[in-house]
């Protein structure tokens, strides 16, 4: 897997070669504009996304007909990683530009696999004393990404799996006693109070009506040099949530209705308002 596949995806979307909604088109054009901008404080360094892609290539699928086969990410997933990890501060390339991320996409699109890779990478290669958490409304949902990550470790070659210490409810990085990767949920009353997260993956974020559980974890990230918060979700009938508030803000940035904040990145797959949902060809926009 190569970072250039992510760049190619963005260009293909902007050329109209891939049928996606307006929000994804605008995101891809924004990404290209950011790469071409030589006048601001950030620069695109492909070595950083390539590093996590190389890590992903060492992992194998753990379920279904592809079990045991190496992970091969889709172009949109490679683009997702490029956008998150590629932009670095010119004065200090260890500092990542993107800190807040949204992946809004239908089910069975590989978002749990993708974010499990990111979670393990952040635990292994992120800040010393990394604290990585998944958050959801219930324990079952919160453990989906966590269990996927544990499955990757169980199927790693020894030289890689030996870098992790795995227990039922926690994964640690060997040699870093302050590191941890855990699943949190509201129903078990295990939330982010007192935590100092470096990476948080909020699963089915659109379903979380208790905004405090999100805000507590977010406020705990302020001391981190490279915090990363990722919303992954499908749509929800409940719109009065912290997630929809943040997604609407990001949409406003894309549409030029709000000042652009480069610390935010999002891929929002879906249909456009004028689309006829009965047209099967249109479904490709959301999948």
Predicted regions and their residues:
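Phosphate/NTP-binding elements of NTP-utilizing enzymes
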Residues: 1-287
């Amino acid at each position: 897997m190569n970072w250039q596949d992510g760049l190619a995806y963005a260009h293909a979307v902007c050329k109209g070669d891939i049928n996606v909604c307006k929000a994804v088109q605008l995101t891809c054009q924004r990404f290209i504009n950011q790469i071409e901008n030589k006048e601001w404080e950030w620069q695109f360094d492909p070595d950083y996304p390539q590093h996590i892609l190389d890590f992903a290539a060492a992992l194998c699928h753990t379920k279904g007909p592809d079990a045991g086969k190496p992970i091969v990410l889709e172009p949109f997933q490679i683009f997702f990683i490029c956008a998150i990890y590629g932009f670095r501060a010119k004065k200090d390339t260890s500092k990542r530009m993107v800190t807040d991320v949204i992946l809004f996409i239908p089910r069975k699109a590989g978002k749990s696999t993708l974010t499990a890779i990111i979670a393990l990478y952040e635990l292994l290669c992120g800040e010393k004393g990394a604290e990585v958490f998944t958050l959801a409304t219930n324990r079952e949902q919160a453990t989906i990404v966590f269990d996927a990550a544990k499955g990757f470790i169980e199927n790693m070659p020894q030289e890689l799996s030996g870098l992790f210490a795995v227990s039922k409810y926690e994964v640690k990085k060997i040699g870093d006693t302050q590191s941890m990767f855990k699943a949190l949920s509201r129903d078990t009353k295990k939330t982010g109070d007192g935590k100092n997260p470096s990476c948080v993956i909020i699963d089915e974020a659109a379903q979380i009506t208790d905004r405090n559980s999100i805000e507590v974890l977010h406020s705990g990230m302020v001391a981190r040099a490279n915090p990363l918060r990722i919303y992954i979700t499908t749509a929800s009938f409940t719109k009065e949530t912290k997630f929809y508030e943040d997604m609407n803000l990001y949409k406003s940035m894309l549409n030029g209705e709000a000042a652009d904040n480069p610390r935010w990145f999002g891929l929002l797959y879906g249909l456009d308002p004028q689309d006829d949902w009965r047209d099967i060809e249109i479904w490709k926009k959301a999948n």
